């Protein structure tokens, strides 16, 4: 087995941060759409937004353009940790099983994607909680990233920072287990078929395909994860909302219908599509650097 290659870790982190900056307002609208309409939480019961574009316009008009980047600091921190570990672990695991990239198979890539998704998302979970809490706040954000971090820790303890970690890991297993293998296999077949070379156009088409696949597979888990993370839990364990992830899933389906699990799908896809395009195009260009 060859020595650990540091490049996928660094390039993965840099490309993830670049993609996050370019698509963050869409991610914010997705969060706002997913937390609204909860019948068991008076604060989020009102349907304020009719869709992604309406949410973008209303947030910008009522809260200011700066509000569209509410939570960008923990999001950047998340990508610096999650994105770095995710891509580096995925590439390292693939080389552990298969030496040559051309010999990669879909089952092996899926296994590597699932493992890297679970590992990276578990480590980076506190930054995800911070991002969602800050995105959910209307008007002025209370205290910035450090202030919100301390507020969660003081009121909810360490447990609050790892709120929803099981769902985050499940979602990451689905997203990474779908997106990265779909990208690799699509790119491989496009090149081997002779239709396209290893160019930016191939990277664009492959990343668009994997973004759509990832959004379809992950949206129900993403809705439940977002609601669980946004729910406050006191140190004594009391909770006024959902008792657990299954309860959240069942209540959402029962009270709001099956398609409530696909709330925020369009902004989710419209984010994952551009996010993956920016990420993979940036990552592929970084790989070409002679370092």
Curated annotation (Swiss-Prot):
State the signal peptide span: none
State the annotated membrane topology for this chain. Answer: Multi-pass membrane protein
Keyword Zinc-finger listed? The answer is no
Activity control, as annotated, is: Increased activity at pH 6.0. sulfate/sulfate exchange activity is inhibited strongly by pyridoxal 5'-phosphate, bathophenanthroline and the organic mercurials mersalyl, p-chloromercuribenzoate and HgCl2.
Provide the family line.
Answer: Belongs to the mitochondrial carrier (TC 2.A.29) family.
Q: Does the keyword Repeat apply?
A: yes
Keywords on record: Acetylation, Membrane, Mitochondrion, Mitochondrion inner membrane, Repeat, Transmembrane, Transmembrane helix, Transport
Its subcellular locations are: Mitochondrion inner membrane
User: Which one of the record's GO molecular function terms can you name?
Assistant: solute:inorganic anion antiporter activity
> In the UniProt record, which is one GO cellular component term?
mitochondrion
Q: How does it assemble?
A: Interacts with VDAC1.
Per its record, the protein catalyses: sulfite(in) + sulfate(out) = sulfite(out) + sulfate(in); thiosulfate(in) + sulfate(out) = thiosulfate(out) + sulfate(in); sulfate(out) + phosphate(in) = sulfate(in) + phosphate(out); oxalate(in) + sulfate(out) = oxalate(out) + sulfate(in)
- Tell me, in one coarse class, where this protein mainly resides: mitochondrion
Identification of the protein by name: Kidney mitochondrial carrier protein 1
- Where are the annotated Solcar repeats, by residue? 7-96, 104-189, 198-289
What does the UniProt record say this protein does?
Antiporter that transports inorganic anions (sulfate, sulfite, thiosulfate and phosphate) and, to a lesser extent, a variety of dicarboxylates (e.g. malonate, malate and citramalate) and, even more so, aspartate. The sulfate/sulfate exchange is much higher than the phosphate/phosphate and malate/malate exchanges. The transport affinities is higher for sulfate and thiosulfate than for any other substrate. May catalyze the export of sulfite and thiosulfate (the hydrogen sulfide degradation products) from the mitochondria, thereby modulating the level of the hydrogen sulfide.
Q: In the UniProt record, what gene is named as encoding this protein?
A: SLC25A30
Spell out which residues are annotated as carrying N-acetylserine.
2
């Amino acid at each position: 087995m060859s020595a650990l290659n540091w490049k996928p870790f660094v390039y993965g982190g840099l490309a993830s941060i670049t993609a996050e900056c370019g698509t963050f307002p869409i991610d914010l609208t997705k969060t706002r759409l997913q937390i609204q309409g909860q019948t068991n939480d008076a604060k989020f019961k009102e349907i304020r937004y009719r869709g992604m574009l309406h949410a973008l316009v209303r947030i910008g008009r009522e809260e200011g353009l700066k509000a569209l980047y509410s939570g960008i600091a923990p999001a950047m921190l998340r990508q610096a940790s999650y994105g770095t570990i995710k891509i580096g672990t995925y590439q390292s695991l693939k080389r552990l099983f298969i030496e040559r990239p051309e010999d990669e198979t879909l089952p092996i890539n899926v296994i590597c994607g699932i493992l890297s998704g679970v590992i990276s998302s578990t480590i980076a979970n506190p930054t995800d909680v911070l991002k969602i809490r800050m995105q959910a706040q209307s008007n002025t954000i209370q205290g910035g990233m450090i202030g919100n971090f301390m507020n969660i820790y003081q009121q909810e303890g360490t447990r609050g920072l790892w709120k929803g970690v099981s769902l985050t890991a499940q979602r990451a297993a689905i997203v990474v287990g779908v997106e990265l293998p779909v990208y690799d296999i699509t790119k491989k077949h496009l090149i081997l078929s002779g239709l396209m070379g290893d160019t930016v156009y191939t990277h664009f088409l492959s990343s668009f395909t994997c973004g759509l696949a990832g959004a379809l597979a992950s949206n129900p888990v993403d809705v439940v994860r977002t609601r669980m993370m946004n729910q406050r839990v006191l140190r004594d364990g009391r909770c006024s909302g959902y008792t657990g992830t299954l309860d959240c899933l069942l209540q959402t389906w029962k009270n709001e219908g099956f398609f409530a699990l696909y709330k925020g799908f369009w902004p989710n896809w419209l984010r994952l599509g551009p996010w993956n395009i920016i990420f993979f195009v940036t990552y592929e260009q970084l790989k070409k650097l002679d370092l």
